[in-house]
Curated annotation (Swiss-Prot):
A Pfam family it matches: SHMT
CC terms in the record's Gene Ontology section: cytosol
Superkingdom per UniProt: Bacteria
Reactions this protein catalyses: (6R)-5,10-methylene-5,6,7,8-tetrahydrofolate + glycine + H2O = (6S)-5,6,7,8-tetrahydrofolate + L-serine
SUPFAM superfamilies reported for this sequence: PLP-dependent transferases
Coarse class of the protein's main subcellular location: cytoplasm
Organism: Rhizobium johnstonii (strain DSM 114642 / LMG 32736 / 3841) (Rhizobium leguminosarum bv. viciae)
Entry keyword Cytoplasm: yes
Protein name: Serine hydroxymethyltransferase
Length: 432
């Protein structure tokens, strides 16, 4: 490369180099600014997190762990990883943290690699009751490599059937029990899970990917000291970059998890993401994060109450955390149809199966809604009640139309109201 081409390589903007990608990013920024984000697993990160994630630390390979790398020149990325580790430990009150997992699936796979052998038995929440693919779904590696015993919720009240958990544990003697899920809106009884695990000599793993921000903020009970290991993603309610963390108080287990992550499952860690994790953990350690977590729960409750008042059923009758499953059958709608109609009205959510759902997984009888992203924008209970009424308006219009095309007039009217609402809560103003 000539000096001119080298200078161009280091200094040309994205808009100049790749206008197609620049344009897509600009359109996505517009979508995020003007639409209401209710996907429970999504959130909005700070400028500081974005800057760390987009930093030159992406250039550095750093196989191994701080102070024990297989590459030279790691003295500064070591600072970032050490800060991420120490902040994660402080945030959750634990002795050990591995901040290298690239995703939620990989953090869970690392725990399996450390604690299980192929063919071993473990228990997890059934996908149809609000579990995750990595908790034993037959289409996932976890369901293919291990003998999975699923537990679920009761058909009457849609609450966890802890008697079933105890009975199945006694019958099958699992090596590992997973507590936690992606669509369960009530408080988890970690103590009871640990008692059941101890009764059969099993490890207790808590996947708190969805509720970690609420745990850090003090509005949901911590799984420690009850669990042997907890995993969490760093986005969702924690408001960090996409990635995972493994937490434990057991030094021997910590060594196993470290070996499972590297070299067992991953190679070089993503140092720019780890730097961004450190920033997000630092933000979550600030006093205002507790206010944020408390507001998330208040907002979710306000939304659930509004939807119930509007004639919808919320699975289990309400929520204690950041999310809810909405049963659409009273509005004669499917999750697929409702997701599309709400999307056209600039309200973003995801179709989701409900417990004992008669519909197919790609159709579903419900949608999952969450409050973290809207709360980050500054929405409070009044805004979430307004959002709930807008959702009911769209679904009532959809019921009248009774077609996949929806009710264009109603959706257009709601879309205008959504833009008026989101315009009052701007985001990323520095981006222009």
């Amino acid at each position: 490369m000539t000096n001119a081409s080298t200078e161009s390589f280091f200094n040309r903007s994205l808009a100049d180099v790749d206008p197609d990608i620049f344009g897509a990013i600009g359109k996505e920024l517009g979508r995020q600014r003007h639409e209401i984000e209710l996907i429970a697993s999504e959130n909005i990160v700070s400028r500081a997190v974005l800057e760390a994630q987009g930093s030159i630390m992406t250039n550095k390979y750093a196989e191994g762990y701080p102070g024990k790398r297989y590459y030279g020149g790691c003295q500064f990325v070591d600072i970032a990883e050490e800060l991420a580790i120490e902040r994660a430990k402080k945030l959750f009150g634990v002795n050990f943290a591995n901040v290298q997992p690239n995703s939620g699936s990989q953090m869970n796979q690392a725990v399996f690699l450390a604690l299980l052998q192929p063919g071993d038995t473990f228990m997890g929440l059934d996908l149809n009751s609000g579990g995750h693919l990595t908790h034993g779904s037959p289409v996932n590696m976890s369901g293919k490599w291990f003998n999975v015993v699923s537990y679920g919720v009761r058909e009457g009240d849609n609450l966890l059937d802890m008697d079933e958990v105890a009975r199945k544990a006694e019958e099958t003697k699992p090596k590992l029990i997973i507590a936690g899920g992606t669509a369960y809106s009530r408080i988890w009884d970690w103590k009871r899970f640990r008692e059941i695990a101890d009764s059969v000599g099993a490890y207790l793993m808590v996947d708190m990917a969805h509720i970690a921000g609420l745990v850090a903020g003090g509005v949901h009970p911590s799984p420690f000291p009850h669990c042997h290991v907890a995993t969490t993603t760093t986005h969702k309610s924690l408001r960090g970059p996409r990635g995972g963390v493994i937490l434990t108080n057991d030094e021997d287990l910590a060594k196993k998890f470290n070996s499972a992550v590297f070299p067992g499952l991953q190679g070089g860690p993503l140092m720019h993401i780890i730097a961004a994790k450190a920033v997000a953990f630092g933000e979550a350690l600030q006093p205002e994060f507790k206010d944020y977590a408390a507001q998330v729960v208040k907002n979710a409750k306000a939304l659930a109450e509004t939807l119930i008042s509007g004639g919808l059923d919320v699975v289990s009758g309400g929520t204690d955390n950041h999310l809810m499953l909405v049963d659409l059958r009273k509005k004669n709608a499917t999750g697929k149809r409702a997701e599309a109609a709400l999307g056209r009205a600039y309200v973003t959510c995801n179709k989701n199966g409900i417990p004992f759902d008669p519909e197919k997984p790609f159709v579903t009888s419900g949608v999952r809604l969450g409050a973290p992203a809207g709360t980050t924008r500054g929405f409070k209970e009044a805004e979430f009640r307004e959002i709930g009424n807008l959702i009911v308006e769209v679904l009532d219009g959809l019921k009248v139309a009774n077609s996949d095309e929806g009710n264009a007039a109603v959706e257009a009217a709601v879309r205008g109201k959504v833009v008026s609402l989101t315009d009052r809560f701007p985001m990323y103003g520095y981006m222009g």
